[in-house]
C-alpha cells in the first residue's frame, strides 16, 4: 500500500529521496483509531487522535512532501518542527535527513506529545526528539536549525524562531490571517535581519495552541493612547490590512475594528481610510511601497519580514 502513496507523490513532482522516505514509515503506527490500510495510504488528512477533548490529525502526505521539497530537505539537516501531532511527519523527515540529521518536534498537547514519543521509540527511530510545550519559544538548545517546518496554523513567525534559524535557513509556515480567516502557506529564507519569501498555496491546519494562536490578544495589551495625527484614504483597504498583519506582527482587533499597535503610535483601519494616532512610520512606509506596487495582494509580492528592522515589500517575486 505504501508503494501507492509513493507514486502519488511522484505525480506531484516530489524528489525520489523524499518520496522514498514515505515508503519507510508505516503511517498506521501513528493513528490511534483503526482504518483500512487502503484508506491509510490515500493522499488525505486522517484523524490521528481524538478523545473528545484534544484532537490531532495526520496531514495530507502530498502537502507535507511538497513542504519538504520547497525547503530543500536533505541529508544531515537539523529541523525544528512546530506541531508534531502523533509523530508521523517527524518520522518521515527523520528518514530524509538521515542518521547525521536531527528532527526536533514540538507538540503543545502533552498528552499527544507523549503518544508521539512512544510511537517513534516503538519504531526504533533515534534521530527525532519530541519536546512537549509551546512552540512559540522554539527549542534553543538544539539550534541553529537549517529548516523550521510548521504543521499548524500560526499567527506569526516569532523572533525566537528567527534567532534559532541559520542564516540562509528556510521556514515553511501556514499563517492565520485575522481579517479573511484564510491560512496561506509561505516559504521564507533568512537574510538577516529579514525573513524574505512569498506565498505558496492555501492550506487548512489545526490552529496552534499557546502564544502561536493568541497574537490579537497579546497585541491588544500594547494599545496606548496617542494624539490624533492624520487620516489617509485607502484603496482596497482589506488587502493592506492583511499586509500589515503579515509584515508587522502588530495587528489587533476590538469589536470588529482592526488596529496596528505600534511602539510610538496606533493606526485604526476603517473601510476606506486609516487614522493615525501618534507616529507610525512603519505603516506609512509600507503604504508608499504598496502603492508603488499597484495595490497588489500578498500573493503577488515578495515579503521582507523585519526583526529589529522595518518590514517592507518588493513588487517582483
Curated annotation (Swiss-Prot):
Optimum temperature is 85 degrees Celsius. Highly thermostable, with no loss of activity after 60 minutes at 100 degrees Celsius. Enzyme activity is observed at temperatures as high as 93 degrees Celsius. The keyword Metal-binding does not apply. Its EC number is 2.1.1.77. InterPro entries: PCMT, PIM_MeTrfase_C, PIMT_C, SAM-dependent_MTases_sf. The active site is at residue 59. It comes from the Bacteria. It is found in: Cytoplasm. Its main location: cytoplasm. It holds the Pfam family PIMT_C. GO terms for cellular component: cytoplasm. It catalyses: [protein]-L-isoaspartate + S-adenosyl-L-methionine = [protein]-L-isoaspartate alpha-methyl ester + S-adenosyl-L-homocysteine. SUPFAM superfamilies: Protein-L-isoaspartyl O-methyltransferase, C-terminal domain (SSF68930), S-adenosyl-L-methionine-dependent methyltransferases (SSF53335). The keyword Zinc does not apply. Gene3D superfamilies: Protein-L-isoaspartyl O-methyltransferase, C-terminal domain, Vaccinia Virus protein VP39. GO terms for molecular function: protein-L-isoaspartate (D-aspartate) O-methyltransferase activity. Belongs to the methyltransferase superfamily. L-isoaspartyl/D-aspartyl protein methyltransferase family. NCBIfam families: PRK13943.1. Catalyzes the methyl esterification of L-isoaspartyl residues in peptides and proteins that result from spontaneous decomposition of normal L-aspartyl and L-asparaginyl residues. It plays a role in the repair and/or degradation of damaged proteins. Monomer. This is Protein-L-isoaspartate O-methyltransferase.
